[in-house]
Amino acid sequence: MKVETMNWITEVVRPRIKTLFKRETPENLWVKCPETGQMVFHKEVEAHDFVIPGSEHHLRMSAQQRLKMMFDQGTWLDVPLPEAPVDPLKFRDEKRYVDRLKDARAKTGMADAFKVGFGRVGGLPMTLAVQDFGFMGGSLGMAAGEAFVRGAETALDKRTPYVLFAASGGARMQEGILSLMQMPRTTVAVRRLNRARLPYIVVLTNPTTGGVTASYAMLGDVHLAEPGALIGFAGPRVIEQTIREKLPDGFQRAEYLREHGMIDQVVHRRDLKATVARLCGLLMQAPAATPAPASAAAQPVPA
């Protein structure tokens, strides 16, 4: 009898007590800083636009979060994006390409790696295109190429600056030559913006590599980058294995590229909106320069 009572206590009562007082803890309650190992509340990180307080490490953002951060509240409209053929090569590696697309869409809630929005940034009309690294590494395929071109066409139609937030591992291998074809297509779209004298500003985020770096991500009128962003064609490990030499510290990082003239400015995420708005305001004011009268030229410039 005593044994049966003990079994009932251990097998029935104790588990129920544990269940009664168990608190469900969300999996994303804490965020660990990749640099320092510091544990921070997810809500606190989100409130700081996904920058770790203290270390200032910039975490990746989704396209939706990026657009929400940049656009003035209540001014943002999604730009409808054209559909592209799905898996024209019937590609399969360890998994069918159509299944990879299905998984990525379920994970991100996006149709593909690009999201384009039209609205106001700092009061200025602007067209923004954002790559989401969470969708198959932000890879460039036919749908992404179509989205970039549609964003450029929107900027041309509405006479606004075009601002790109790049985040990609490069061309999408599952689409082969059809993916590589997007490199010249997007380059032509940038050329159309240039001929229309509309600013094209690129913000390089972590990481921006491969065919994206070899095309539209390096064709901007102004190139900004977030701190610590990896920017290059091939990754540092591939380069080291190829040349069999140790690369310099910080090689291919935003700060290194800034020091060597590859980009114009490294901008903290909290300052991006104001910086982009200021640049676009300056570049959109492009009246023809007229020589000042001689009398006016002699007057001192007011402080």
Curated annotation (Swiss-Prot):
Keywords: ATP-binding, Cytoplasm, Fatty acid biosynthesis, Fatty acid metabolism, Lipid biosynthesis, Lipid metabolism, Nucleotide-binding, Transferase. It catalyses: N(6)-carboxybiotinyl-L-lysyl-[protein] + acetyl-CoA = N(6)-biotinyl-L-lysyl-[protein] + malonyl-CoA. Pathway: Lipid metabolism; malonyl-CoA biosynthesis; malonyl-CoA from acetyl-CoA: step 1/1. GO terms for molecular function: acetyl-CoA carboxylase activity; ATP binding; carboxyl- or carbamoyltransferase activity. GO terms for biological process: fatty acid biosynthetic process; malonyl-CoA biosynthetic process. The keyword Nucleotide-binding applies. The keyword tRNA processing does not apply. Its EC number is 2.1.3.15. Its main location: cytoplasm. It is an enzyme of class 2 (transferase). Signal peptide: none annotated. Acetyl-CoA carboxylase is a heterohexamer composed of biotin carboxyl carrier protein (AccB), biotin carboxylase (AccC) and two subunits each of ACCase subunit alpha (AccA) and ACCase subunit beta (AccD). This is Acetyl-coenzyme A carboxylase carboxyl transferase subunit beta. It comes from Methylobacterium sp. (strain 4-46). The lineage of its organism: Bacteria, Pseudomonadati, Pseudomonadota, Alphaproteobacteria, Hyphomicrobiales. The gene is accD.
